[in-house]
């Protein structure tokens, strides 16, 4: 029974009360999902390549432990790219990162912003596309250089294998 799975319930009244439950709340990250966010879409403006934009973002977020920043660093490492150093960086709590990135490889550096759409708007960055069905519900990370919008990344935390089946089984109970 339940005790062999490590579940102990003290009193039958608790089991009886389960019949009246109509809502279950689960922690998403690491419970429903794998807990390993990954870049799943990259969109840049004309004239800016994926590599340039991602390396600028990676440089700005080099020392961040935020899960979205870690996803960017993992992507760079998987590609075998070197994250360029930044001259300075600043965390803007609940918004994103500001950094000064010197020129690197064949790319110009500049004043880099990485973060939320709201952060970009507050910093006077315009030209961002409207949020649409392809980005709805995903984690978006916007990137700008010298006040100009460069593009965005979408980052997803993959759902654990078998979780959809488990949730559907719970729904039927």
Report residues per predicted region.
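Juxtamembrane helix-loop transition segments at the membrane interface in multi-pass membrane proteins
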Residues: 1-12
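Cytosolic catalytic headpiece
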Residues: 10-173
């Amino acid at each position: 029974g339940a005790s062999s799975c490590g579940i102990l319930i003290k009193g039958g009244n608790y089991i009886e009360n389960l019949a009246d439950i109509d809502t279950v709340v689960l922690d998403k990250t690491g419970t429903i999902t794998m807990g390993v966010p990954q870049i799943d879409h990259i969109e840049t403006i004309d004239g800016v390549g994926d590599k340039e934009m991602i390396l600028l973002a990676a440089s700005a977020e080099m020392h961040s432990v935020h899960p979205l920043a870690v996803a960017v660093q993992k992507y760079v490492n998987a590609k075998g790219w070197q994250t360029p150093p930044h001259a300075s960086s600043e965390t803007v709590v609940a918004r994103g990162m500001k950094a000064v990135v010197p020129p690197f490889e064949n790319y110009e550096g500049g004043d880099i912003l990485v973060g939320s759409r709201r952060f970009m708007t507050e910093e006077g960055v315009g030209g961002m596309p409207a949020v649409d069905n392809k980005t709805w519900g995903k984690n978006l990370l916007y990137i700008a250089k010298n006040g100009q919008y460069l593009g965005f990344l979408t980052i997803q935390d993959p759902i654990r294998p078998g979780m959809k089946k488990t949730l559907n089984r719970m729904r039927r109970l």
